[in-house]
From Swiss-Prot:
Designated name of the protein: Scytalone dehydratase-like protein Arp1
Protein keywords: Lyase
Gene name in the database record: Arp1
Family: Belongs to the scytalone dehydratase family.
Annotated function: Scytalone dehydratase-like protein; part of the Pks2 gene cluster that mediates the formation of infectious structures (appressoria), enabling these fungi to kill insects faster. The product of the Pks2 gene cluster is different from the one of Pks1 and has still not been identified.
PANTHER family, per the entry: AMIDASE 1
A GO molecular function held by the record: lyase activity
Enzyme class at the top of the EC tree: lyase
Binding site for substrate: Y323, N404
This protein's record includes keyword Membrane: no
Sections of the chain in a coiled coil: none
Domain of life: Eukaryota
Amino acid sequence: MQNLTDKGAIIFGVQKTSQFANGETATADWVDYHSPFNPRGDGYQDPATSSAGAGSSIASYEWLDLAAGSDTGGSIRGPAAVQGIFGNRPSHGLISLDNAMPLSPKLDTPGFLARDPYLWNAANAALYRENPLSRWSWGDSQPSSILSRNKTLFMNWFNENILPRSSDPLTCSSGLLLHVDGSAGFISRNGYINPPVPPFGFSNGQISVFAETPDSVFPLGQVPAFSSITNHTEYLPVTINVVAAKGCDVLIAKLAEDMVAAGILKVLKIGAGIEGGEILMRRYFVRDDGDEVMSRITSRGRLLFQDWDRLRGILAPTLYVDYTKIGKGKWEAMSADDFMAMVSNDDFLGDLCVKTQHLIGATSWERVSESKVVGHHQLRAAHQVYTSPDLKTVKLRGHSHATNEHYYVKSDGVWKFAGLKPEVRWNEHKFEEVFKGSYTQSEKHS
């Protein structure tokens, strides 16, 4: 870290890692504290493990340029692959791990995750400091008895027969080995896995671990996939891993720069896809310097605040709406356009100063016909009203305990939301003052 700060890096903070930097899956294994969210796709994909917070933050925050992590058996490459960003496992022993808590000293390596390969290369250069080739030239001059004690049979075989160093210092590596790590498959965070079994087999991701070679993740693009979480087509990243000969780390980073310059790779963006796009939920907060920053963090069961297009897409042509219990009217057949205009208005859910969270309790379903279903839900709707859209100062709170009927109809073969009827049981604090247009002044104070 001192090397980075010497080059002008500003350390922003620390990030979540899995317990003991071990291999864990979201929800199933993250027990003591919550796993970070992967912002890509439907926002409900596993962020991978160990350096999960580093990968999630780089894919989520535009103001964050670089994240440091460690890779023992894939702890940088895994988060990089599933979140479609650049990440590297350096040649083992190239970078000092003095004062770092070890997991496996013979396998541990530090590395970076980044969206911009130019910045990634500059950070790697700061970490390496000296030319890696000069380090290995020095190592090659040492007695073979010392080297043999630090190599395994696989390492010798691979580095001598599969991917040896080139005699040309400009090319460094005799070749490159490519393997696929991120293949755009859904790995949802709400799945529970089988009990652990003895390890079996050997994956391509383990080559660099045992051969001590550099292995880096290159995001190639993204592909569409239908999500069972959002019921929409989302986009998942596709990545490839590039392995070079031991000590040829700079070659890989320069290759990424050249591929961006040639238009083959891209500088990546934050969001639901590697080319951008809104994440399922947004939070506003203010840094110490007073600049407003929008962090986009995914959250289960929550649509993007003000993602009105997504809401419009699930509405039936007409809706039954009974808002009499929250100070509005009742409509037997409100058009979808009128419903959108009402809920998105500044005096209702479109108010940027209002934040709300709906917690659903017991639920039952009533099948009225082949084309109509009614959902009956217990509900606690919590609201906070702020003095301004920067959401710094709370003005008032108002919470409602209710049951809610939701209506669904099949329209042209597709199930659509067709209305609602909340039945308020009791309120907490100043619920009547949450929405500006819901109650008249006389009703608020009656």
